[in-house]
């Protein structure tokens, strides 16, 4: 559930100057108002305000049995100078810009929820590089279970809106997320925030004609599911709704009567099924031990390949994504050990609305080095596609 302790409206029937004094908001007038949103900011130093907010969250867990909360606009809580110019904010007691009272409040909030509601999750929507969002409070962290990976979302969506010709010049947008992927426990979220306010729906963000939009979205979802981190896709994106989300009307379920939309839904269903069945996707999700690049720098063909695995696994799943409308034959990927590849998912499958370009049978590795690996394999990658292969290491070749 989206839960917002960062600010509240000035409406006279609400909490603003509740008893004629700044009861819920900051006592210092210039720090009480959010300069960008025109709302009021809670006084996190107040025990009464802390009790009110934490009780609010607990109420939803106890009475409505929610699974977790997503705390909105955490960045605006953490920085005293958020949205403010020099001279418009007051430093903390240590002379810095971090809102120490908000930090203490978030730590208390997470401790309270995770102790009293075992199995609950707390998620921070935080868009900066503030450290230790998902670290335990006793280690100096805020104590959240997960943090939304805003960087992955922005980079991949910006990339997918580019004409494929220009993607080679922006290859880093695909790969940069792995520079920080294990610094927090991330959720890769394509949320409601990205399909409102004239930002376009997920399918309409994709570059190209009608067929290419569907192929591109299948490729993007395939990359999202194989990338380290948990997954979140807002409703409607799984079957390619063309209009933006409107809270005042239902989704366009009638689109499932059209082959391309139903095929996309089937593809998303298969991604979920495969994700549940292949533990390499989540067993080692927060360490380089679970991920290895197999081909990362082929910017000319805008194609990447990587391995998901875990320590002790006899192989894993290889993911290859082609972000151009050009078929790549004899595409080379490195392999850490001799073994075989067998295609287990192909977004270009005719079942999912594709053209049906496959890798038939078993592909065997060659003792030909590639990048820093001693072995390699040659595969076919369809245009605008994501292909998963089951990789089995040949015995006695580890």
Task: Give the location of each predicted region.
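Conserved, mostly hydrophobic/aromatic
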Residues: 2, 53, 60, 71, ...
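Catalytic cores of secreted or luminal carbohydrate-active enzymes
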Residues: 259-281
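Alpha-helical packing segments of well-folded alpha/beta enzyme cores
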Residues: 49-60, 105, 109, 220, ...
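Substrate-binding/active-site clefts of carbohydrate-active enzymes
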Residues: 1-97, 363, 379
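Conserved alpha/beta catalytic core and glycan-binding cleft of carbohydrate-active enzymes
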Residues: 65-67, 85-250, 276-348, 355-356
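Residue-level preference for long, well-ordered alpha-helices that form the structural scaffold
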Residues: 46-49, 53, 94-102, 209, ...
């Amino acid at each position: 559930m989206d839960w917002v302790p960062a600010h509240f409206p000035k409406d006279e029937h609400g909490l603003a100057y509740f008893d004629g004094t700044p009861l819920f908001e900051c006592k210092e007038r210039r720090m009480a108002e959010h300069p960008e949103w025109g709302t009021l900011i809670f006084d996190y130093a107040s025990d009464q305000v802390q009790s009110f907010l934490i009780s609010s969250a607990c109420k939803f867990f106890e009475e409505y049995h929610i699974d977790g909360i997503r705390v909105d606009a955490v960045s605006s809580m953490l920085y005293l100078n958020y949205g403010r110019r020099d001279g418009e904010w007051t430093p903390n007691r240590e002379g810095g810009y971090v809102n120490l009272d908000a930090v203490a409040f978030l730590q208390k909030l997470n401790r309270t929820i995770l102790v009293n509601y075992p199995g609950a999750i707390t998620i921070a929507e935080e868009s900066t590089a503030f450290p230790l969002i998902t670290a335990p409070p006793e280690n100096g962290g805020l104590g959240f279970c997960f943090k939304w990976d805003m960087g992955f979302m922005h980079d991949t969506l910006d990339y997918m809106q580019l004409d494929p010709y220009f993607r080679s010049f922006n290859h880093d947008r695909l790969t940069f997320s792995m520079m920080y992927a294990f610094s927090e426990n991330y959720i890769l979220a394509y949320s409601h925030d990205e399909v409102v306010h004239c930002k376009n729906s997920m399918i309409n963000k994709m570059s190209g004609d009608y067929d290419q939009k569907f192929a591109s979205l299948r490729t993007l979802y395939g990359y999202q599911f194989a990338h380290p981190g948990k997954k979140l896709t807002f409703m409607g994106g799984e079957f390619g709704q063309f209009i933006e989300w409107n809270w005042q009307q239902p989704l366009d379920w009638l689109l499932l009567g059209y082959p391309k939309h139903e095929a996309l839904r089937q593809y998303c269903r298969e991604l979920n099924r495969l994700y549940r069945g292949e533990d390499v996707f989540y067993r080692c999700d927060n360490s380089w031990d679970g991920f290895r690049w197999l081909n990362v720098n082929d910017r000319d063909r805008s194609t990447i390949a990587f391995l998901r695995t875990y320590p002790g696994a006899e192989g894993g799943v290889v993911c290859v994504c082609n972000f151009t409308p050009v078929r790549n034959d004899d595409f080379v990927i490195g392999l850490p050990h001799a073994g075989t590849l067998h295609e287990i998912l192909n977004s270009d499958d005719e079942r999912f609305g594709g053209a049906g370009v496959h890798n038939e049978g078993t592909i065997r590795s060659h003792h030909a080095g590639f990048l820093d690996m001693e072995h390699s394999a040659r595969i076919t990658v369809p245009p605008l596609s994501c292909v998963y292969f089951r990789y089995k290491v040949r015995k006695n070749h580890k």
